[in-house]
Every structure is written in C-alpha cells, then in structure tokens.
C-alpha cells in the first residue's frame, strides 16, 4: 500500500493447517466494511490479503510464515516451453466471459471435486460450499468459460479489479485432464489482464512445501510478498 491505513481485523482460533499438517493455522479477517469494493480489495491484495466468499483474510500463523502472496506482471511474464505447448494444444478452446453463474457451472464443479479431490477437504461438494467461497455480494466474480464445440469443459473464476485480476478457482471436466486446463486458465487470465491494460494477476498464496500450492512458482518472472515487501523472482528454485 502507498499510504498507511489502520485496519479493523479479527483473529480466528488456531486449527490444523490444511496445507502443512504439522503447523497451526490462524487468520486475520477484515472487519472494516468500508474496503469491501473492487478498489479497496485491490489495495488489500498488495498487503497480502485474499478473498473467500464475502470475507477478506490473511494468514497470521503463530509459528509459520510459509504462505507467500504471489503475483505475475502481465507484460513481463515469459511463458516456458511447456506453457507454450499447452497454449497451442488448447487453440481449439473458445473462451467466453460471463458475470452470470450458470447452472452448468455447478454441475461441472461437482463432477470435478468428486473425481479430482475426493480425498480433500472440499469433498463432498455442495451448492452451499460452492457459493460460500466463490460468490461475493459486494463484487461479483467474472467467469472465464472454456468451451469445446460449444460444450463447457472448464471454468476459471477471477476477480476483475481496476489494475489487476485475482484468480480465485478453476475447475474442469476430468475427461479433459490431458489438456492441462488449470495451466491454460492461468495463461488465459494473464492474456486477459494484458489485453485490458491490467498490470497484475494475483494467484493467491504459494506454499513451497505443499504440492497443491507450489505449482504457482512455474510462472516466471513473478513477485512474492516476503516480510512485507514484494520481491522479484525470475528463476525456479534449485
């Protein structure tokens, strides 16, 4: 943030971390409703906060700082050879933008969770769960549809902000897993940011020790929020 802002926040009770099972998780939750708008949220993103449903939070764990906010500059990003291949592979995909949450989205989400994440905390899927973390009353998310021959095979949910995008969640038809639609969704959001003159795509938190969260480091160069400062990372760790 470019100016000092005093935030009213709450602190959640400690509980086992869903990313690192040996750690205790605790979150700061924003209580100041004056910042619940697109520009306010964008400022909070630069300070390491994140949206889930209507709530904005940031990790505040007692003995761990593994979560690092990560963002990619839309003009500086250089796709790797494999990312170029994935983009080429999906040239036959039609991308459609929508602010309407269509019934077919949840049907696809439910199938995705049941087949891809049946061993995780999001199983079993439900409409309440789906709406609880994707929907937002004060800022409707943008849905990036991926269609093959007019059939919905993937959806990336993202927040469209004044100067950036914030990727929320991507789900897809497990029958098309060989297309690497998760990677394609991020590449498509980067292209959307670039075409609309938005500088950044925020990807949420990177957790190096967690396989489900460390895939984000493959998008280079990127920036990570480390000890309150955004640091440029232009190479993969050894």
Curated annotation (Swiss-Prot):
GO terms for cellular component: cytoplasm. GO terms for biological process: ubiquitin-dependent protein catabolic process via the N-end rule pathway. This is Aspartate/glutamate leucyltransferase. Functions in the N-end rule pathway of protein degradation where it conjugates Leu from its aminoacyl-tRNA to the N-termini of proteins containing an N-terminal aspartate or glutamate. It holds the Pfam family ATE_C. Keywords: Acyltransferase, Cytoplasm, Transferase. It is an enzyme of class 2 (transferase). HAMAP family: Bpt. The lineage of its organism: Bacteria, Pseudomonadati, Pseudomonadota, Gammaproteobacteria, Aeromonadales. GO terms for molecular function: arginyl-tRNA--protein transferase activity; leucyl-tRNA--protein transferase activity. Belongs to the R-transferase family. Bpt subfamily. It comes from the Bacteria. InterPro entries: Acyl_CoA_acyltransferase, Asp_Glu_LeuTrfase, N-end_Aminoacyl_Trfase, N-end_Aminoacyl_Trfase_C, N-end_Aminoacyl_Trfase_N.
